[in-house]
Each structure stands twice: as C-alpha cells, then as structure tokens.
C-alpha cells in the first residue's frame, strides 16, 4: 500500500506543475504523466490529456487526481457530484509497477507509515493540568484538615503549595496519574507575598527548599523530573509559607504535530477555503473518514489512515488551485464574485 500512496502522491504533484499550457516539462514529468495517463485512460475510459487547456480537459485531469487521492486513501466517496463518478479501477492503475514514483514521495509515505506505527517521546503542547476540573485561587494560602503541606492546582500548568511553619512533605502525588509523562520539566519559586484565609498578607521567608530524590533544587531553574522520584518541600521557618511549581513542559508518548514534517501546514492547506466547490468536496471526502469535515482536528491525528489522508488531500488541494476545475457538488451553491474574508468565514458557519 505504501507504493500505491507514493504513486498517487507523485502523479498529483506532477499535475500541479502544469501551470501553463506551453510550459517545458521536465523529462521525469513527461515520463510519469505519460505512463500514468495511458494506464488510467485505458482502465477508466476517460480522456485525460498531458497538456490540459480547455475547462473540460482540466476537469478530466482533476478527476483523475481525485480518483487517485481517494483510492490511495481507501475512501469510497459515493455520489457526491453529477459531474464525477469515482472509478474503482484506479487502484489497479496505482498498482501498476511501470508507473514510477519519486524518491521524495516514497520517503514521505515511509515516514508516515513508520511514525504512525510506533511511539516516541514528544514535547506536549498542552498544559499538564489541562483536564483538571477545579482550580484554586493563586496566591491564597489553603490547608486541608490534618495536613501540614497542601498542594493544589491553580492553572493548566501551575501548582501552588501551602506549608505550615516547620512543615516538610512530599507533593509528587498531585502529578501522578496524569498524562503518563516520561519527563516533566519544572521550575519552582517562593511566593514572596500571599494572602491568608483571614485576608491578611504574609511573606514566605528565605530558607524554604524543594528537593528531588533528596537533592535540593535551585529556585528559578528548570528541573528535569521523571514524575516518580520523591518531590519534597521543606519549610524550616517559623511561619507559614507558599511555593509555586510551574510545569514548563513535559514529554510523553502522545502523538504531536511533529510526527510528520509540515503536518501543521498540511492540515491548514486541507481546511483552507478556496471556493465553495472545494469546500463542499473536502467536506464530502472527510465525511467518509474519522477526521472532522470543516475545522481542523482538536488533537493531532495519530493513525496512518488519517495522516495519509491529510497528506494526499493537501496535495489534491494544490492540484485544484492549479487546474481551476469547475464542476458541481451536491448541495453546494457557488457564489460568484471575488473571494473575500467574509465569504470564506461564512462558509464555516
């Protein structure tokens, strides 16, 4: 299946180079287009030409690229247009060993398959405590009953710890059971002035320490902590104290947008508004997948099918911009006139 996807990607990118009717094509472009179009026309009985000039010819070439895109992604789009019918035989075209694919396309498909089939440490973009259901007021001292050290969450990446005079205690439990981190990068600081429950202000005196595995850590410096070693705070002073612990970032096995080069840009390209026809076509294609059909996914896609679909559909978007086809999509009423931000914004409503 990797070679099928690589051929589809190669042919679509070659078609995206046909920006002028009289352009001098590179030899490899001529070879790829010649073989691919010959095989495609033979199996589908279409009439795709190597140098599309008329609207009908541009439409035919775009429909060929659309066939290749959905075939390589394993998508059956169904009846989405009165002008287009998906040719299931296209998968046989892409399986033809005579159609060459570029090294670049093969490497990209190999990266998609390789990265989505395994896991690796990745810096996560969201706050460590993002899914916490309740937070406490920052800078306000709070102590639970029968405790001398109380850590609480006060933000998506922030913990504050209240300590009684002379108290010492471990606080690693507040981090555990969340996000399955491999490493957490922390910075701790004294809260110089804080509010007591009665409303009066109090200071944290110098001398408060934070240690990881029994080793004192300097305030204001990034600490690499595995989330398992004892994270202990000691207030040797004779009055209450407060400490702030900030999660600068953490590393876990969760997938991120870095699993594939330029995945962020590919997603933007897929979901960008070009015109109402493309908007309807992209929606119809993605309706047959697990990806959202109009707005980018909240979390990075983490399976091969989704990442491959984004890569192929982004390339099809480039072909659409170059060939400028005109055809109907069921339920879509194109609006004449120049594209404006207001028109694009209204399409997502």
UniProtKB/Swiss-Prot annotation:
Glycans are attached at residues 193, 287. It is found in: Virion. GO terms for molecular function: host cell surface receptor binding; structural molecule activity. The keyword Magnesium does not apply. Keywords: Capsid protein, Glycoprotein, Outer capsid protein, Virion. GO terms for biological process: fusion of virus membrane with host plasma membrane. Gene3D superfamilies: 2.60.120.170, Bluetongue Virus 10, subunit 1, domain 1, Bluetongue Virus 10, subunit 1, domain 3. InterPro entries: Capsid_hemagglutn, Orbi_VP7_capsid, Orbi_VP7_capsid_C, Orbi_VP7_capsid_N, Virus_capsid_a-hlx_vir. One of its GO terms (cellular component) is viral outer capsid. Its main location: virion. The VP7 protein is one of the five proteins (with VP1, VP3, VP4, and VP6) which form the inner capsid of the virus. Belongs to the orbivirus VP7 family. Homotrimer that assemble in a complex of 260 capsomers on an inner scaffold composed of VP3. This is Core protein VP7. It comes from Bluetongue virus 13 (isolate USA). The gene is Segment-7.
């Amino acid at each position: 299946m990797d070679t099928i996807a690589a051929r589809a990607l190669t042919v679509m990118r070659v078609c995206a180079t046909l920006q002028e009717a009289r352009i001098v094509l590179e030899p490899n472009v001529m070879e790829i287009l010649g073989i691919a179009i010959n095989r495609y026309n033979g199996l589908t009985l279409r009439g795709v030409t190597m140098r599309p000039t008329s609207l009908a010819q541009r439409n035919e070439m775009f429909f060929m690229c659309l066939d290749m895109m959905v075939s390589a992604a394993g998508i059956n789009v169904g009846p989405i247009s009165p002008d287009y019918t998906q040719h299931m035989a296209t998968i046989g075209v892409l399986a033809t060993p005579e159609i060459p694919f570029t090294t670049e396309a093969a490497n990209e498909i190999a990266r998609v398959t390789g990265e989505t089939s395994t896991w690796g440490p990745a810096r996560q973009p969201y706050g460590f405590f993002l899914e916490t259901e309740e937070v406490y007021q920052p800078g306000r001292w709070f102590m639970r009953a029968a405790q001398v050290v109380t850590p609480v969450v006060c933000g998506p990446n922030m913990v504050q710890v209240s300590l009684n005079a002379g108290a010492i205690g471990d606080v690693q439990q507040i981090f555990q059971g969340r996000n399955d981190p491999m490493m957490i990068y922390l910075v701790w600081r004294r809260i110089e002035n804080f509010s007591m429950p009665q409303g009066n202000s109090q200071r944290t005196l110098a001398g408060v320490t934070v240690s990881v595995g029994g080793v004192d850590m300097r305030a204001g410096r990034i600490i690499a902590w595995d989330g398992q070693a004892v994270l202990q705070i000691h207030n040797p002073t004779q009055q209450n104290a407060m400490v702030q612990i900030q999660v600068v970032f953490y590393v876990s096995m969760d997938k991120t947008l870095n699993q594939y080069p330029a995945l962020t840009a590919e997603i933007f390209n897929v979901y960008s508004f070009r015109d109402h026809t493309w908007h309807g076509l992209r929606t119809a294609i993605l309706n047959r997948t697990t990806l959202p059909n109009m707005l980018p996914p909240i979390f990075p896609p983490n399976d091969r099918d989704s990442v491959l679909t984004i890569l192929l559909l982004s390339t099809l978007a480039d072909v659409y911009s170059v060939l400028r086809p005109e055809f109907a999509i069921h339920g879509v009423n194109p609006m004449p006139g120049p594209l404006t931000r207001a028109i694009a914004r209204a399409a997502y409503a």
